[in-house]
């Protein structure tokens, strides 16, 4: 009985001596604070639209779907050989598709930081023509690319 009382008191003392947890409990990165494709603050909307080119529009997208971002453990002598040769092995970043996009008006003196604060996902360049994979043999349609990945 004496051992269990001593053990309980030691445990209570150790727990009381722990430092408090940091943060607010709401997550360490709030909102758009972690952007995979950050843009320079001095970049204007006109410069950003020029980077997109004349076949794409500057847009603000509110949905990103990332696939393929995982770690795979291979076993055996030749395990993972084919996937590593095709570039799908460890370290591959996956594919990011942007959806639910709206156009950003191009005003030469407006900084890109203003629309970027309102976007839930990275500012992107989207094709002017509708990208559809309906009826195609391969079926790939990638209409939007994050602007930060082009800089």
UniProtKB/Swiss-Prot annotation:
The gene is rolA. SMART domains: HYDRO (SM00075). It comes from the Eukaryota. Belongs to the fungal hydrophobin family. Changing residue 77 to S: Reduces the affinity for PBSA. GO terms for cellular component: extracellular region; fungal-type cell wall. It is found in: Secreted; Secreted, Cell wall. Its main location: secreted. Interacts with cutinase cutL1 in a pH-dependent manner. Self-assembles to form functional amyloid fibrils called rodlets. Self-assembly into fibrillar rodlets occurs spontaneously at hydrophobic:hydrophilic interfaces and the rodlets further associate laterally to form amphipathic monolayers. rolA rodlet formation is regulated by the strength of ionic interactions between rolA molecules. Three types of self-assembled structures of rolA are observed: spherical, rod-like, and mesh-like. Keywords: Cell wall, Disulfide bond, Secreted, Signal. Changing residue 32 to S: Reduces the affinity for cutinase cutL1. This is Class I hydrophobin A. Induction: Expression is highly induced by the biodegradable polyester polybutylene succinate-coadipate (PBSA). Disulfide bonds join 52-125, 60-119, 61-101, 126-144. One of its GO terms (molecular function) is structural constituent of cell wall. The Cys3-Cys4 (residues 61 to 101) and Cys7-Cys8 (residues 126 to 144) loops form hydrophobic segments involved in adsorption of hydrophobins on hydrophobic surfaces. RolA enhances the polyethylene terephthalate (PET) hydrolysis in the presence of the recombinant polyethylene terephthalate hydrolase (PETase) and the PETase-hydrophobin interaction has a high potential to increase the rate of PET recycling. The lineage of its organism: Eukaryota, Fungi, Dikarya, Ascomycota, Pezizomycotina. Residues 1-17 form the signal peptide. It holds the Pfam family Hydrophobin. Aerial growth, conidiation, and dispersal of filamentous fungi in the environment rely upon a capability of their secreting small amphipathic proteins called hydrophobins (HPBs) with low sequence identity. Class I can self-assemble into an outermost layer of rodlet bundles on aerial cell surfaces, conferring cellular hydrophobicity that supports fungal growth, development and dispersal; whereas Class II form highly ordered films at water-air interfaces through intermolecular interactions but contribute nothing to the rodlet structure.
